[in-house]
Amino acid sequence: MKPAVLALALCGLVSSTGISAAQEVKPLKVMLITGGCCHDYKKQTEILKKGLEERINVTVDQIHVDDGSTKPALPIYGNPDYGAGYDLIIHDECAADVKDEATVKGVLKPHVEDGIPAVALHCAMHSYRVGDINKPAKEGSADALWFEFIGIQSSRHGAQKPIEISFKNHVVTKGMKDWTTINEELYNNVKVFKTADELAKGKQEGEKDAVVVWTNTFGKNKVKVFGTTLGHNNATVEDPRYLDLVAKGALWATDKLDTAGKPKPGYGRVKK
């Protein structure tokens, strides 16, 4: 086994049949949404696309706008059927001031109504803030629209400092070891919804410990959502441990991760 494949195997991203079976399995079609305030999304969209396509059997289509505002002009707005034909949507946008309830419902429609699973990364948790973000939102209320879907409500972060990550036992985290990030943002937890399952906590000097990795199952379609608040800086996003985590979260959300934490046949790394 080649060294690169061996490294992925140690993280559970290559199964014994994954490479050969992947030749016969159609790649998962993934939409990656990036753009908005405060992050190097132009670079991060490329890091994520490359990292995911190297690790698992996916094709990543990028929906990116080079708009650094808190109201990025993403083409998904006003187009509630934007997810048609996709197996997974990754929300990595930062849109804190997109607050119109109808717009937020349109963003949620492919998930809540059509049942398309999701991955939510970093500032996605600080997007689509309808109502008072500092008060725990009541389930079913307009204030909870986005937060209830992703599973966690967050309102702020502190200064950038290293975060000590401690994982819990879960199929997504099998084979992963605790690690400490470079300087990063620890997002607070205003509320962790009952449907969310905590996978890792983060500890940072001067801040209260917070859930930083989780899964959520939401709504009438029991749509699966994998989330992490980690990933502000490019160096974190391109860290192989981070990319492994997001890749396994994507497989979990699409029901392509087995009980041993490995890709189901055909969904592991595709041999190039």
Regions found by a protein language model. Give the residues of each.
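Catalytic beta-strand/loop cores that center a nucleophilic Ser/Cys/Thr
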Residues: 53, 59, 152-222
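A glycine-rich, often tryptophan-bearing local segment used as a flexible ligand/cofactor-contacting loop or short
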Residues: 96-175
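Proline-centered loop/turn at the N-terminus of a beta-strand
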Residues: 117-119, 197, 224
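Sec/Tat signal peptide C-region and signal peptidase I cleavage site
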Residues: 17-22
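Bacterial N-terminal signal peptides
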Residues: 5-16
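Helical hinge/lid and interdomain linker segments adjacent to catalytic or ligand-binding clefts
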Residues: 23, 29-33, 40-127
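Active-site rim elements
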Residues: 35-38, 157-162, 231-240
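Extracellular ligand-binding/catalytic regions of CAZymes and related secreted enzymes
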Residues: 23-28, 43, 54, 84, ...
